[in-house]
Amino acid sequence: MHNFSKLAVAFVAAASFASAEPETKAKVERPIIYFPRHIKRQFANTTTPASEASSSTSRPPPIPVPETSSFSSSASSSSAQELTASRQPTSIDEFFSTLSDALTTDSTPFSQRPATSGAGRSSATGDVTPIIVPSSASPPSTAVKPGSVSALTTSQNSTSAATSESVTSPGSTSGPAGTPESSSASDFTSAVATSRASTATSNTGLIPETTILPTTATSNTGLIPETTILPTTASLSTAESAVTPSITSSASSSGILIAPTGVVTPTSSSSTEDPVFDGIGTLISSIVSSVSTVLQPNGTAPVTTTPNTSVDVATTPVDIASTTASDTLSPTTAVVSTTGPVTSVQTLPPVSTPTANGTVTSPPVDSQTTVLPTTTPGLSSDTIVTSPGVTANSTQVPTTVPTTIPTTQPPVTEPTITPTVLPPSPNNTVPSNTTTQLPPTQAPTLTQLPTTTTSPALTTPATTPSVAPTSATSSANSNDDWLPTTIIVQAPLPSTTGSSTNAPSSAPTVLPSDLPKIINPSDDITEPLGPDMMEIQVAFKFALNYRFITNENPNAGAQIFEYLPKSLKYMEGLTEEQKKRLQVLRVVPLNTEQQLGYVTSVAIATWPKAFFPQLRLDVKTPFSQFYQNTSNGMLAHNLTMLVNPAIDILPGATLDGKPAGAGSGTGGNGSNGPNDVFNNDNNSTNQSATQRGTVAGIAFGAVSLAAAYGAAMFIVARRYKKKRQAHRRSSSVATPSEMRQSGSPALMGGALLSRDFTHYGGVMGPAGGRESHGSNGSGRSAGNSARTAGISAPVAQENSLGWN
């Protein structure tokens, strides 16, 4: 029970010392270590085998004790007395002295939790044989910041301070109880942390594979396995370790060893004097100078990539080294970037002298090296001399220049640019050539169309401004080479077109012999149409007549092959595959000189069969989407405005609405379509206005005749009805007699009359026949008048017998 109480008091004292450690570390500015009188010094054997070291570390750790905190035995005992007032203070001293004696004789390693200072620094832990509680101990000012263990192994020049004489940066690990504890290289190698002092003290590494060469100075070994320590001075080893998170500050004359556990362990009796620590300041200054000397030649990438810098004094040289390395690389990169574009241009040696060190002129050089080689060499060499603002203007020049100037007149362009300022010269020269492309093409065309001998004169002015030949050579490569903003067309004739249309011929004329029979595209089209495709024809107006596109300006014919497929892509519903298959197969002439005064150009193109009726209707409609669509470009839109809708898109159709082989006279298919009023043939839509008026008149006459016939029949029927009604009105008096005679009363009347006649005759029979007969008549009249007083007399007029 008494021993348990001592253990509890020890725990309380350890906790108080750990809490008081940050303030103590903050106050101490340099390492001052005092040894109490209860220290029992013991030398550790440096030749302890690795097996013994590893076996010694396998023992269970005793009670943890705080590390490298500035405290005294009196302070610890006083704090323990405050916490345990009922205990005797002398028992604590006896406990510590007994515990020190027991732990001194035992070689069991001891591990403890790290005690961090206010600056976030921690002492390294290790395995030591003696555990000594100093009366006043403070950590050295070279305490390093805690870093991960992985940081010790990733540095190439890292050296361990586990066996050196200063505090090294520990790696943070987790103890068995889950509490964080500091571990140095000795925790990973399980070796003895102390070494025996001799006249030439040598601190060995913590890994059994480490080979130590004889030396007169203390050498600090690294933590990496199979590391050979070469003879070196203390300042050199310290300088190398300053680069890595683990910092070692060694002194060959000092015999005091600060173990990884933070407990001071003397290695020799001669090293316990205080003046030894007075030389630590001098040693640190020498370390700083050595670090500065060593780091400058070793300013490599690992120096800048180390995340944790251990010694504050060594931080500045490391930053300087990293800054020096970056400054050294930056000029190299800048020189490469500046030199690269300049050397790529072969015409720059006289120009690169004033702008060799300028980085602002490099981007303009880049932009111009990609554009200006397409122009003349004189342009590229002179343009680079200008300022960056002026270079921007010169980069816009090759958009219209590259295909025109170098191909025709390079010598002429250079004299215009050299004597004048560079930006105005290309800007004034190139637009002049560009804008003069149309006037030479149009002006000669107006005067030279009537004859064919003027076509050479048209070619000569086109060659002079060096624009027309350029567009002719590049027509198959780029769309903008023909004309950027308009379609090449021929100006209309004044009055020849109107006079020729009034005299249509009765027989087709023969095409002129100087015109080609067909115009094929530059690339041969060998793909079949397919079952869903068909051929259509698109005729053009006088602006693109066949003579103009063949003999006078071939570029006008080339633009039909280029822009007509684009204009046909307007229709909604076409798939991408169908749009790709839209192409102009050929351009053929259609002889319309008798009707229109020129030979019509007809383009034969491919088109899906399913959309043929819609396209046919759109071509006939002036305001359809075929003419109004601009989504495929203004050039394609302008080309559709030159389509002649009077000629059907059905292949072979002519201006008269007949196939090309039928001619303009009667016969063949010509007698079928126009004369059939209800004809649904394809040629019915091409009927003339007179034919359509005739058909409408016939239809109207038929309807009128039918209406008149109906009205006449109605009148006749009505008159017949009225006549019949009048006839019935005249015989309406006999109607009651018919009613009377149609029934039994008539018979009865007849019978009664007969009876009366018999009666009267029988009565008056004897008097004579005549009288009886007369009596019979009078009696009948009397009987009729008596019995049928309401019936009129004319009954007997129609039928003397009285029957119907």
Swiss-Prot record:
Q: Where is the composition biased (Low complexity)?
A: 46-58, 69-80, 128-143, 150-169, 189-202, 395-407, 427-476, 672-686, 774-787
HKR11-MSB2 homology domain (HMH), as annotated region? 482-641
- Topological domains on the Cytoplasmic side lie at 716-804
| Domain of life of the organism encoding this protein | Eukaryota
From the UniProt record, which GO molecular function terms apply? Answer: osmosensor activity
What InterPro entries is this protein classified in? MSB2
Domain comment quoted from the record: The extracellular serine/threonine rich region (STR) and the HKR11-MSB2 homology domain (HMH) are essential for MBS2 function, whereas the C-terminal cytoplasmic tail is dispensable for appressorium formation and virulence.
Q: What is this protein called?
A: Cell surface sensor MSB2
Q: Which gene encodes it?
A: MSB2
